């Protein structure tokens, strides 16, 4: 039997002895024949084995820390998990009922909401007791709170870190008072997902990897700003097939960011079985390719969620970097409410459901609510205590549903409010009125084709585009100090076209950040860094490469203010056009791709003075430009 102190001493001694034993094995006579041999270029036997040993010992230490955290949990913590899981299951039952029966709308119809449930996956609430929750901190310190980026099914985790049942109901039913109001009173219902940024819950998105990629950027901001903050990014196994998720893990591994990724293997992603998603033995194996320690846990046990999150948090905040937690689980319902009949089978037997009964039976027996309830009883809880808690939670959720139903529906004309900090979007009516006023003709510019309003100089000391942009970037670096970062490909040596030489000459090398060659993670992580307290300047090296960041630009950065009123102070520089002399894929004229997106501000300078002014002014906006 160990206590905390004796277990710590045992763990320390165990690791020392194991490390010593591994060192001794390297020099056994049977290995002497490969001593000094080059295993791979520039890596001999000794160096190769030392690195392998270092990673192995890291995994052993993390395993011992998980055991330590699991062993330190008391009855009160188990009862808290049971309460949160009970609340989640009660929410699930209401959400299914709402979807099936709907509630009345002003036009005389019915609406049933979005509908994602957590059945059999409520154990994820265990993560919350390992986190520094925003709701437990004074308002002035909430920027230091840990951040979660839940998947759509993690209702229990959102509730456990502080979202209320009313928030979840209002979001999934699209009521005017929901959090998804673009920061405008009574303008909710724009997005039917969970989330509350002020409580440390990054709202998920339908393009699944956006949330984890954005959370990676928030983690990047924490590291650059030296904020002691941890980040947790759960996804499903289907999302783990997406390139943007891999790019997020790759950046986190390369930069040692304080984040834990969590792949929840639901067994079936919508209707695609795991054999169609990955050839790896486990989804945890995906971490090793990124240099990230990973392990597998049972998703029906909140204790394993708690211990794994606690160990990951400790490792990350001690400077170890990211981890990957693989969760074996199964959802006891369809992908969404509408999917239940196809997935499980209709009550009428038609359709019969395609999921094997044996698979369903196995996971039904692992249902965390009754199993963990029995465990609570076995360690000292009493039946009356649990019944009282269950009645309380049911009453809380019932009351929240009633209050949600009393909330007004949003007015349709509120949907145009706040697409950027500067303006609202036009309605179709307003667009048609403008077309009629303009007579349907293309407006003429102030100059005829080929005319110039500015006389360009050939003098050796005249300003150029490049010089103007360099001067503007130096001015921004000096104005914003530690809050600014210039991020993109090949930034730290000189940057494309040597544009970063002035920043380096002025002593701002520390503000330059080389990114992996992935336009998507450049923009997604820059968006996250903007949410995390920075004012990034992101660079896409050539115009055509912006296509690789389309999802990040239009489905992420452009929509955050409109969805929930977020400030996203992000400036993106993209050189394009014939002057780059770079041909196809590089010089593409891309303005038409983005100018019709209401959440993006597009500026296109035509001379050096405008290049300077627009870069300075753009960066003062709290919007993506």
Regions found by a protein language model. Give the residues of each.
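Active-site nucleophile and cofactor-binding loops and adjacent substrate-binding regions
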Residues: 109-121, 151-153, 185, 193-212, ...
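Glycine-rich ThDP/TPP pyrophosphate-binding loop and its adjacent helix/strand module
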Residues: 1, 197-400, 405-406, 595-625
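Cofactor-binding active-site loop characterized by glycine-rich and histidine/acidic residues
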Residues: 106-255, 273-280, 284, 289-291, ...
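Short hydrophobic alpha-helices that are characteristic scaffold elements of the AMP-binding
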Residues: 530-531
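Short acidic, glycine/serine/threonine-rich loops at helix termini
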Residues: 127-129, 159-164, 243-247, 271-276, ...
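Conserved acidic/glycine
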Residues: 1-126, 130, 141, 333-507
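A glycine-rich helix N-cap at a beta->alpha junction
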Residues: 168-182, 253-263, 511-514, 557-576, ...
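Glycine/charged-rich beta-loop-alpha catalytic/anionic-binding loops adjacent to active sites
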Residues: 105-111, 189-205, 229-232, 290-294, ...
């Amino acid at each position: 039997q160990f206590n905390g102190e004796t277990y710590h001493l045992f763990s320390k001694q165990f690791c020392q002895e194991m490390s010593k034993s591994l060192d001794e094995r390297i020099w056994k006579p049977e290995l002497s024949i490969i001593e000094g041999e080059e295993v791979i270029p520039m890596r001999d036997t000794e160096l190769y084995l030392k690195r392998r040993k270092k990673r192995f010992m890291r995994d052993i230490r993390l395993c011992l820390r998980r055991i330590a955290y699991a062993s330190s949990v008391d009855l009160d913590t188990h009862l808290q998990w049971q309460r949160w899981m009970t609340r989640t299951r009660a929410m699930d039952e209401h959400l299914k009922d709402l979807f099936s029966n709907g509630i009345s709308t002003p036009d005389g119809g019915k609406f049933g909401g979005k509908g994602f449930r957590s059945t059999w996956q409520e154990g994820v609430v265990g993560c919350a007791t390992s986190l520094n929750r925003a709701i437990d901190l004074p308002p002035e310190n909430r920027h230091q709170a840990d951040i979660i980026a839940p998947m759509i099914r993690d209702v229990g985790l959102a509730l456990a870190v502080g979202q209320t049942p009313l928030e979840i109901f209002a979001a999934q039913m699209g009521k005017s008072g929901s959090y998804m109001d673009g920061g405008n009173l009574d303008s909710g219902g724009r997005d039917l997902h969970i989330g509350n940024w002020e409580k440390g819950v990054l709202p998920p998105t339908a393009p699944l990897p956006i949330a984890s990629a954005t959370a990676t950027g928030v983690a990047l901001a924490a590291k650059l700003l030296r904020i002691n903050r941890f980040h947790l990014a759960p996804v499903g196994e289907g999302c783990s097939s997406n390139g943007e998720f891999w790019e997020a893990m790759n950046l986190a591994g390369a930069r040692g960011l304080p984040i834990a990724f969590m792949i929840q293997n639901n067994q079936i992603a919508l209707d695609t079985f795991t054999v169609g998603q990955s050839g790896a033995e486990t989804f945890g194996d995906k971490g090793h390719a990124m240099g990230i320690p990973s392990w597998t846990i049972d998703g029906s046990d909140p204790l394993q969620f708690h211990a794994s999150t606690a160990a990951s948090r400790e490792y990350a905040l001690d400077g170890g970097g990211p981890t990957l937690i693989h969760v074996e689980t199964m959802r006891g319902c369809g992908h969404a409410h509408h999917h239940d009949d196809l997935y499980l089978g209709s009550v009428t037997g038609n359709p019969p459901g395609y999921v094997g009964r044996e698979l369903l039976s196995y996971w039904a027996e692992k249902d965390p609510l009754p199993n963990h309830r029995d465990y609570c009883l076995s360690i000292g809880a009493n039946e009356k205590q649990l019944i009282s808690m269950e009645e309380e939670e049911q009453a809380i959720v019932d009351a929240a549903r009633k209050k949600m139903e009393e909330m007004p529906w949003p007015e349709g004309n509120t949907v145009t409010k706040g697409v950027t900090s500067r303006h609202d979007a036009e309605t179709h009516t307003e667009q048609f009125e403008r077309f009629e006023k303009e007579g349907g003709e293309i407006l003429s510019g102030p100059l005829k084709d080929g005319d110039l309003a500015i006389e360009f100089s050939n003098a050796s000391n005249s300003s150029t585009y490049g010089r103007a942009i360099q001067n503007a970037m130096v001015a921004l670096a000096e104005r914003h100090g530690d809050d600014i970062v210039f991020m993109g490909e090949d930034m730290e040596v000189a940057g494309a076209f040597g544009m970063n030489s002035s920043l380096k000459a002025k002593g701002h090398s520390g503000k330059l950040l080389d990114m992996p060659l992935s336009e998507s993670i450049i923009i997604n992580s820059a968006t996250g860094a903007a949410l995390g307290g920075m004012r990034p300047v992101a660079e896409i090296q050539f115009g055509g490469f912006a296509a690789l960041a389309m999802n990040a630009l239009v489905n992420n950065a452009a929509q955050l203010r409109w969805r929930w009123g977020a400030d996203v102070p992000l400036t993106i520089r993209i050189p394009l056009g014939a002057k780059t002399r770079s041909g196809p894929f590089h010089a593409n004229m891309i303005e038409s791709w983005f100018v019709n997106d209401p959440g993006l501000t597009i500026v296109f300078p035509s001379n050096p003075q405008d290049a300077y002014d627009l870069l300075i002014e753009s960066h003062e906006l709290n919007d993506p430009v």
